[in-house]
Amino acid sequence: VNEIIHKWYSNPAKALEEAKVKRKPVMLQFERDNCSGCRKLYSVTFKELEVEKEIFKYVIPLRVNILKEREIRRKYSAVWTPSFYFINYKGKLFYSFSGYLPPEDFRIILRLGVSSFLVPQGKYSEAIEILEEGIRLFPENPRRPELMLKLGMAKYLKTWDNKMFRREMDEIRRRFPDSAIARMWAWEDENYTP
């Protein structure tokens, strides 16, 4: 059987080295003993095959104990477990999230973290692809407006089409009027319709 065994890194230096070689972000996870969110993450979320596939497709996973790895904890001001930090091979932070996530939400946060790594590098098409996939896969998830906002930003930065970005924001306001993202409408004409 040619089964691929996926392994999380526990050594930050080795994970950063691998990230440099593979040109992927590191997804740093802080854990600790007696963390109920960590236990549920391992028994529910990380048991799902699609979650595991996507982790190893998109990131270099690194897991460290928040109480034992003081230097790295201090660098990111980490205080909670589980928590996730998407960083480049130099250790620069691009996105973070704290708390337990069920499988679908984790897959969305993974996409938000990876796209936050890709966009500053000008890899707009890659970011757009991963965000559009998330929107297709999780049409009813309450985190969808976050995906839509990041998608609108990536498209805008790729094309500099302001009207397109306003249409994306308007769709968020129409479909998810109570979301925090819908409240980010920045234009004076409150009743704008594309």
Locations of regions flagged by a protein language model:
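Thiol-based oxidoreductase modules, predominantly thioredoxin-like and allied folds used
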Residues: I4-S10, F30-R32, T45-R70
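A short beta-strand-turn-helix
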Residues: W8-P25
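Short active-site neighborhood of thiol/selenol oxidoreductases, capturing the structured segment around
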Residues: K22-C35
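Short solvent-exposed coil/turn linkers within tandem alpha-helical repeat scaffolds
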Residues: L49, S96-Y100, G134-P145, I172-A186
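Alpha-helical segment of the N-proximal tetratricopeptide repeat
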Residues: R74, L110-E140
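Non-catalytic, surface beta->alpha helical segment in thiol-disulfide oxidoreductase systems
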Residues: A78-V114, L118
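Single-residue signature of alpha-solenoid repeat helices
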Residues: A127, M164-F165
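TPR/TPR-like alpha-solenoid helical repeat scaffolds
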Residues: R144-L157, A180-P194
